[in-house]
Regions:
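Residue-level signal for functionally critical sites in structured catalytic/ligand-binding pockets
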Residues: 1, 9-16, 67, 80, ...
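Phosphate-handling substructures
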Residues: 1-55
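Conserved histidine-centered catalytic loops in small-molecule metabolism enzymes
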Residues: 4-10, 26-38, 110-139
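A generic, residue-level signal for flexible/boundary positions that often mark functional hotspots
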Residues: 13, 93-95, 133
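A short acidic, glycine-rich active-site loop
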Residues: 19, 92-96, 139
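Generic surface-pattern signal
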Residues: 35-43, 61, 65, 123
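Active-site-adjacent alpha-helix immediately C-terminal to a catalytic or transition-state-stabilizing loop
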Residues: 54-115
Length: 139
């Protein structure tokens, strides 16, 4: 077994795929990374894709079963997985949906009788003024 490593190091060492340095490269890289990860092709990473999906699903259901509202501060990866779990997204669609997620963006999931529903995606009202749009970041 390998010592724990990050996903970018794992895919570089095990598959010869380096982390891209620009947006266009990352657009192609993310679906590839998710595919390799979901197929169990990354040894020594902190968590398998299946375990990550199960963990996010469990937390979503735990929060939805609670009383009142909840505020969760998290990463784009967790937001993407929450969308996958909530809307049964296949892997290419999930990867594509993750790409536009902005740092410091707001997302809202609402529990309904039929399950969780995504009711807000990628909102940045605190950065939407013209003089703040320079602060929009994705990576």
């Amino acid at each position: 077994a390998h010592p724990e490593r990050t996903f970018d190091v794992g895919i570089a060492e095990q598959h010869g795929v380096t982390l891209p340095s620009d947006r266009e490269g990352f657009i192609l890289h993310l679906p590839q990374l998710f595919t390799v990860w979901s197929e169990g092709g990354l040894e020594g990473v902190p968590e398998s894709f299946a375990d990550f999906e199960a963990r996010v699903s469990e937390v979503l259901h735990e929060i939805a079963a609670g009383e009142g509202r909840a505020l969760v501060v998290t990463s784009g990866g967790v937001i993407g997985m929450a969308m996958r779990v909530t809307m049964a997204l296949d892997l290419p669609v999930m990867a594509h949906a993750c790409l536009p997620i902005r740092n410091a963006s707001l997302h809202r999931f609402q529990p309904l009788a039929t399950g969780l529903a995504l009711t807000q995606f990628n909102a940045t009202p605190h950065l939407d003024q013209r003089d703040r749009q320079h602060a929009w970041t994705h990576l």
